[in-house]
UniProtKB/Swiss-Prot annotation:
A GO BP annotation: methylation
Protein name as it appears in the record: 5-methyltetrahydropteroyltriglutamate--homocysteine methyltransferase
UniProt binding sites for L-homocysteine: 455-457, 508, 623
Top enzyme category: transferase
Record key words, sorted: Amino-acid biosynthesis, Metal-binding, Methionine biosynthesis, Methyltransferase, Repeat, Transferase, Zinc
Length: 777
C-alpha cells in the first residue's frame, strides 16, 4: 500500500474566470441556460481530469457550484423559503438565482431575459442573507429555516456530478456539507428557535443522498463539518455523534471521510476521533500541534488525512521540513492509513502560478497556487513511497526557495521597524472625547437630520473596465486615461448633487479593487495577473500578496479627492481602506506576526489620513469591512485579536483634529459579540450592513448604548433588486425605534461597484426620498 493524496475542493471559477463571465451573460439574458450549464460542465471536466493527471487519488466532486455550495445544500434538501414561490419538485435556475440575488418581480413582459434569475410575475423578494464563510474571504448564503421545516431530496447534483466524472474515467470522492454544520450556519426568524432541532428531520435526506452515491459506485464520501473547529456545546457534540451514527447506518457500503478545517478540533477532538467514520482530516497548518494528540487518541484503523499544505495562502511549502514531520507518522500509522491533503479546500487560492508571466521572478519562486500545491503533495507522496532520492531535485528546489525567501533583503526595511518602535499610546487616541468632537463636526459640516450618503464606490461600467484594461495594456496614454476618469468622476458628482445626497463620494473609478488599489501604491506588496479567487457567485477578487515590510512612498488618494471636492460645495468624503481590512483581504506573509504587519499598514494609512485632512477633507472614511472576519474561530482567542485590530484602526485614524469626522464601514457583520471593540474604535460614524437582517443588527448598538453616529444600510446592494421607498422608510422607522434620530445616517448596505447604473440610480433616488419622508415624520 502507498500514501495517497487528496484535495478537499478545487477552485470553481476557471483559470480565466470562465464561470464568472458565463453567469453574467446568463443573468443579462445574453445566453440561455444550456450555454451556462455547458460552461459549468466543461470547467468540471477540466478540473477533474487535471487533478487526476497530477496524481490525486481522491479527486473531489460536488465541490463545484454555480453560486455557493451552502445554497446548493439548501436546494438539495428542499429548504426553500415560501417567499420564493417554490411548489416542490426540481428547483429551477430562476428560483436558485432568486435565492442568491433577489427577485425584482417584474411582470413577464418586462422580464430582462431568460437568464435574469427573476421569476416573472412573482412578488419581489430579497436574496437570502449573505455572510462570511468562517474566517475566510468567501461568502455563503445562509439557509433560512423555520419550526416544523420539512426536508426532501430535491436535487440529484451530488450523484449527477459523480457520474459525470465517472464517464470521463475519473473516480471521485463526492463532497457534502455536513448536516450539523449546515444547520449551525442556518438563520431563522423564529424567536428562540434553534435550527439544530431539525436534525432528525434532515438526516433521512442525507441518508438518501449517501445511498444514491453508493448505488452510483462511490466508495468514499467526504463530509465537511467545519463546525468542529468552533467552540461546541456538549449537546452539539452529542448531536454530531447521533448524526454520524445515523449516516453510517443509512449507507453501510460507503466510507466517510470527515473533514474539518480552518483550525484544530481542540476539545472536540475526542468526539471527532470516536465518530463512526472511516477517515478524519486534520488541518495541520492551523493546528500543527494536534497531530500527536490525534495519533494517540484515534483507533489504528482510522485513516488520517493530513492537511499539511496551506489551502488558504500562497506561500510555497518547505517540503524537506514537512517530510521530517511526515516520515515518522507514516512509519507509525502505516502508509495505507495516511492521506496527504491541503489544509482545506483550494477554493481560497488562485488556480495556477504558471499563468503569472509578469510577476517578479524573485517573488514568484516563493509562491504556490492550487495546481502547484497539488504538485507539492505529489512530491511528498513520492518521497514517502519511494524515498527522498526519487524526488531529490524537487526537494532541493523547495529548500532553495525557502532559503532565498528567508534571506532576501526585500523582506525587511529597517526604517519601518524604527518607526513602529516609536509608536506611543497617544498616537492611538483622538485629541478629545466623542461628545466634544461631535459639536466641532456639527459646526463645520452643518448637515440635516438623517444625512444621506453612499458607502464609496459607484458602478464600474463596461466602459470603465475597458478603459482600465486599455491603459494597462499601453493602448491609451496616461493623459487619455486620466481625462476619462475625471469625466466619470465629474458625472458621478453632478448626479449625486442632482438627486440630493448630502455627503458625496467621488465614485472610485480609478480603483480596480479597494485593497489592490492601495497595495499597488504601498511598498511590501506584489500583485498578480490571474490570481483570482471567488468571493461569492460571479464576484472574484485578486488579493494582494503581502511579502515584506509595508510603507507609503507617496500620497495615494489626495489628488483624486482634491479634484472631486473642487466640483462641489457639498462635503466630499476621503475614501480609504483600513489596515485590518487590507491585512485580512491579502495573502499575508507567514514569517511575521499578523499584528505586526497590521501596524505597519496602519502607519501608512495614518500618513494618508493626515495628508487628506491637510488638503481640506472634512470627512474621511476608513473602511474596515473585514474587521470581524479576522476573528479567530475560538472565543478564547478573540480578545488578543481585537486588541491589536482596534489599536491598528486607531493608529490609522487618530492623527486628525476634532472637527474632522472619521467614518468607518463594516459589512457581512454580526455585532453583538464584538460591540465593545467597535465602540473602542472610536469612529465618529459607522455604516453597517443591516438591510437583509431588517435592522436587527442594531439591537447590539442599543444594548451597548453606542454613543456615536450610525448609518444602517437601508437596502441590500448584493442584489439587483430595487427596493421601494416604502420598504426603506419602514427600515428607517425600525432604526429610529432603536436609536435616536440624531445618531442616524441613511445609506446603502455597501459600495455599489458591482451594480449597474440604472438599478443604482433608481435605488438611490428612492433612498433619498425615504430619508426626506422620515425627516418629515
Amino acid at each position: 500500500m502507498t500514501v495517497t493524496i487528496a484535495t478537499l475542493g478545487f477552485p470553481r471559477i476557471g483559470p480565466k474566470r470562465e464561470l464568472k463571465f458565463a453567469l453574467e451573460a446568463y443573468w443579462a439574458g445574453k445566453t440561455d441556460a444550456d450555454a451556462l450549464l455547458d460552461t459549468a460542465r466543461d470547467l468540471r471536466a477540466k478540473t477533474w481530469t487535471r487533478q487526476a493527471a497530477l496524481g490525486v487519488a481522491h479527486v473531489p466532486s460536488n465541490d463545484f457550484s454555480l453560486y455557493d455550495h451552502v445554497l446548493d445544500t439548501a436546494v438539495m434538501v428542499g429548504a426553500i423559503p415560501a417567499a420564493y414561490g417554490w411548489s416542490g419538485g426540481t428547483v429551477d435556475l430562476a428560483t436558485y438565482f432568486a435565492m442568491a440575488r433577489g427577485d425584482q418581480g417584474r411582470p413577464a413582459a418586462e422580464a430582462c431575459g431568460p437568464g435574469c434569475g427573476h421569476a416573472p410575475g412573482a412578488d419581489g423578494v430579497p436574496a437570502l442573507e449573505m455572510t462570511k464563510w468562517f474566517d475566510t474571504n468567501y461568502h455563503y448564503l445562509a439557509p433560512e429555516l423555520s419550526p416544523g421545516q420539512a426536508f426532501a431530496l430535491t436535487s440529484s447534483k451530488p450523484v449527477d456530478e459523480f457520474l459525470e466524472a465517472k464517464a470521463l474515467g475519473v473516480h471521485t470522492r463526492p463532497v457534502l456539507l455536513g448536516p450539523v454544520t449546515f444547520l449551525k450556519l442556518a438563520k431563522t426568524k423564529a424567536e428562540g428557535f434553534s435550527p439544530l432541532s431539525l436534525l432528525s428531520a434532515l438526516l433521512p435526506v442525507y441518508g438518501q443522498v449517501l445511498r444514491g452515491l453508493a448505488a452510483a459506485g462511490a466508495d468514499w464520501v467526504q463530509i465537511d463539518e467545519p463546525c468542529l473547529a468552533l467552540d461546541l456545546t456538549d449537546f452539539e457534540r452529542a448531536e454530531l455523534r447521533r448524526a454520524y451514527g445515523a449516516l453510517t447506518h443509512a449507507a453501510p457500503g460507503v466510507r466517510l471521510m470527515l473533514t474539518s478545517y480552518f483550525g484544530g478540533y481542540g476539545e472536540n477532538l475526542a468526539t471527532a476521533v470516536n465518530l463512526p467514520v472511516e477517515g478524519l482530516h486534520l488541518d495541520l497548518v492551523r493546528a500543527p500541534d494536534e497531530l500527536e494528540a490525534a495519533l494517540a487518541a484515534s483507533r489504528e484503523s482510522l485513516v488520517l488525512s493530513l492537511g499539511v499544505i496551506d489551502g488558504r495562502n500562497v506561500w510555497r511549502a518547505d517540503l524537506p521540513a514537512l517530510l521530517d514531520r511526515l516520515e515518522p507518522v507514516v512509519a507509525r500509522r502505516g502508509s495505507d492509513r495516511v492521506v496527504l491533503a491541503p489544509s482545506c479546500s483550494l477554493l481560497h487560492t488562485p488556480i495556477d502560478l504558471d499563468l503569472e508571466t509578469a510577476l517578479d521572478p524573485e517573488i514568484r519562486q516563493w509562491l504556490a497556487f492550487a495546481v502547484q500545491k497539488v504538485e507539492a503533495l505529489a512530491v511528498l507522496a513520492q518521497a514517502l513511497n519511494g524515498g527522498r532520492a526519487s524526488v531529490a531535485a524537487a526537494l532541493e528546489a523547495s529548500a532553495q526557495a525557502a532559503r532565498a525567501r528567508a534571506t532576501s533583503p526585500r523582506i525587511h526595511d529597517p526604517k519601518v521597524a524604527e518607526r513602529l518602535a516609536a509608536v506611543t499610546p497617544d498616537m492611538t487616541r483622538r485629541r478629545s472625547p466623542y461628545d466634544q468632537r461631535r459639536e466641532a463636526q456639527r459646526a463645520r459640516l452643518n448637515l440635516p437630520p438623517l444625512p444621506t450618503t453612499t458607502i464609496g464606490s459607484f458602478p464600474q461600467t463596461t466602459e470603465v473596465r475597458q478603459a482600465r484594461a486599455a491603459f494597462a495594456k499601453g493602448q491609451i496614454s496616461d493623459a487619455t486615461y486620466e481625462a476619462f476618469l475625471r469625466q466619470e468622476t465629474a458625472r458621478a458628482v453632478a448626479w449625486q448633487e442632482t438627486v440630493g445626497l448630502d455627503v458625496l463620494v467621488h465614485g472610485e473609478f480609478e480603483r480596480n479593487d479597494m485593497v489592490q488599489y492601495f497595495g499597488e501604491q504601498l511598498a511590501g506588496f506584489a500583485f498578480t495577473q490571474s490570481g483570482w479567487v471567488q468571493s461569492y457567485g460571479s464576484r472574484c477578487v485578486r488579493p494582494p500578496i503581502l511579502f515584506g515590510d509595508v510603507s507609503r512612498p507617496a500620497p495615494m488618494t489626495v489628488d483624486w479627492w482634491r479634484y472631486a471636492q473642487g466640483l462641489t460645495r457639498r462635503p466630499m468624503k476621503g475614501m480609504l481602506t483600513g489596515p485590518v481590512t487590507i491585512l485580512n483581504w491579502s495573502f499575508v506573509r507567514d514569517d511575521l506576526p499578523r499584528e505586526t504587519a497590521c501596524r505597519q499598514i496602519a502607519l501608512a494609512i495614518r500618513d494618508e489620513v493626515v495628508d487628506l485632512e491637510a488638503t481640506g477633507a472634512a470627512i474621511i472614511q476608513i473602511d474596515e469591512a473585514a474587521l470581524r472576519e479576522g476573528l479567530p474561530l475560538r472565543r478564547g482567542d478573540w480578545d488578543a485579536y481585537l486588541d491589536w485590530a482596534v489599536e491598528s484602526f486607531r493608529l490609522a485614524a487618530s492623527g486628525v483634529a476634532d472637527a474632522t469626522q472619521i467614518h468607518t464601514h463594516m459589512c457581512y457583520s454580526e455585532f453583538n459579540d464584538i460591540i465593545a471593540a467597535i465602540g473602542a474604535m472610536d469612529a465618529d460614524v459607522i455604516s453597517i450592513e443591516t438591510a437583509r437582517s431588517k435592522m436587527e443588527l442594531l439591537d447590539a448598538f442599543v444594548g451597548y448604548a453606542y454613543p456615536a453616529q450610525i448609518g444602517p444600510g437601508v437596502y441590500d446592494i448584493h442584489s439587483p433588486r430595487v427596493p421601494a421607498v416604502e420598504e426603506m422608510t419602514t427600515l428607517l422607522a425600525a432604526a429610529r425605534q432603536r436609536l435616536a434620530g440624531e445618531q442616524l445616517w441613511v445609506n446603502p448596505d455597501c459600495g455599489l461597484k458591482t451594480r449597474k447604473w440604472p438599478e443604482t440610480q433608481a435605488a438611490i433616488v428612492n433612498m433619498v426620498e425615504a430619508a426626506r419622508r422620515a425627516r418629515a415624520s
